Amino acid sequence: MAFPYLKNRLAVLILGAGIGWMGSCSPAPTLPDPLMAGWNGKPVCECLHEDEQLRVLRCTFPPGGGHDRHFHAAHYGYVIEGGRMQITDKNGVRIVDVPSGSSFNNDGVEWHEVVNIGDTTSVYLIVEPKGN
């Protein structure tokens, strides 16, 4: 071949284009955090406090209301008003009776969706530390 360097450059261009194409055909999904996620286009959570160290959200779920698919960073939760919630995540669907006054914490949630399938409004406080 008269121009061997051209063959190498062409191979790099084709390979590079192929890699870029593959990435654009299957982009990683970006999910909202709990504050940005809503239900039927309306907010579910409100920010009560935010500073350099933490953020505190109050999330309210009337009967039949829910929270569209979202992720959570590490957080602590406190249940002000409990209820019966249907939770969908990568493990499937489960129904949980959440008592008022209970609490929970975890290192984060890849994704989940929740729906209040009970008869009363459920209210949660979510405390998210920053910088962890």
Predicted regions and their residues:
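Histidine-centered metal-chelating micro-motifs
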Residues: 64-67, 103-115
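Ligand-binding loop in jelly-roll beta-barrel domains
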Residues: 109-131
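Bacterial Sec signal peptide processing site at the extreme N-terminus
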Residues: 26-37
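Bacterial N-terminal signal peptides that target proteins for export
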Residues: 2-13
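A short glycine-rich, His/Asp/Glu-containing loop-to-beta-strand
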Residues: 38-68, 74-77, 127
